[in-house]
Amino acid sequence: MATLLVLHGPNLNLLGTREPGHYGAVTLAQINQDLEQRARAAGHHLLYLQSNAEYELIDRIHAARNEGVDFILINPAAFTHTSVALRDALLAVSIPFIEVHLSNVHKREPFRHHSYFSDVAVGVICGLGASGYRLALESALEQLAANAQPK
């Protein structure tokens, strides 16, 4: 049984009401519930945290190493374009991660085109709405299964 951690950055607590044209009508609670059910059905454990505070996300990443978290799914939200500290935390714990964005950041304002995470992530999923989280979970589970196979 693997343990996966889902991290949601700033303002994602407002999903469902915040700019639904960009982010959709699905709430964060619905996303977490869907992911938790899918992980459990596959025999795995899922943890999650949403925070508007960078240091809380960093502290949670640090704790993940000591808890034996096997994979991280992260939507850094606005921290995508600003947070070297979050990037450094992810690199420091050496837990593979997938970067997720609800909207297609490349179709938005130019300042949203740069990510401090994409070049060190296992993969990036953007622009697919809440389905992006499901696809990221499926990919993480596939990778964990492949890595568990004897070579």
Curated annotation (Swiss-Prot):
EC primary class: lyase
Pfam families for this protein: DHquinase_II
Active-site residue list: Y23, H101
Record site feature (Transition state stabilizer), residues: R18
One Gene Ontology MF term: 3-dehydroquinate dehydratase activity
Pathway stated in the Swiss-Prot or TrEMBL entry: Metabolic intermediate biosynthesis; chorismate biosynthesis; chorismate from D-erythrose 4-phosphate and phosphoenolpyruvate: step 3/7
E.C. number(s) listed in UniProt: 4.2.1.10
Keywords, sorted A to Z: Amino-acid biosynthesis, Aromatic amino acid biosynthesis, Lyase
Family of this protein: Belongs to the type-II 3-dehydroquinase family.
Record function comment: Catalyzes a trans-dehydration via an enolate intermediate.
Protein name: 3-dehydroquinate dehydratase 1
Gene: aroQ1
